[in-house]
Amino acid sequence: MNIRPLHDRVIVKRKEVESKSAGGIVLTGSAAGKSTRGEIIAVGKGRVLENGNTQPLDVKIGDTVIFNDGYGVKVEKIDNQDMLIMSESDILAIVEA
């Protein structure tokens, strides 16, 4: 399915959380928790400013990001995978290799 978010929205595929503790214990279920890292799958054209101009987003397709997993983040099933739709302002950082 082709999908393009509007304005300053992005679509993020959540990365799997590490399932082992620091001591090597395998974590399952809620103990493993949800990851707040993901990969940008699609981006909107940018935020529309008051003067009508569009400010491009700082993130791009393929970026790994850390995001705020809370209010305003929508989970949607796309191609049988859960994807997150959020505003760029919900992204806290870009992970640089």
Swiss-Prot record:
Keyword tags: Chaperone, Cytoplasm
Pfam families: Cpn10
Main location: cytoplasm
Subcellular location: Cytoplasm
GO cellular component, one term: cytoplasm
Protein's UniProt keywords contain Mitochondrion: no
InterPro entries assigned: Chaperonin_GroES (IPR020818), Chaperonin_GroES_sf (IPR037124), Chaprnonin_Cpn10_CS (IPR018369), GroES-like_sf (IPR011032)
Family matches, as NCBIfam families: PRK00364.1-1, PRK00364.1-2, PRK00364.2-2
Family label: Belongs to the GroES chaperonin family.
Protein name from the UniProt record: Co-chaperonin GroES
Organism encoding this protein: Buchnera aphidicola subsp. Tuberolachnus salignus
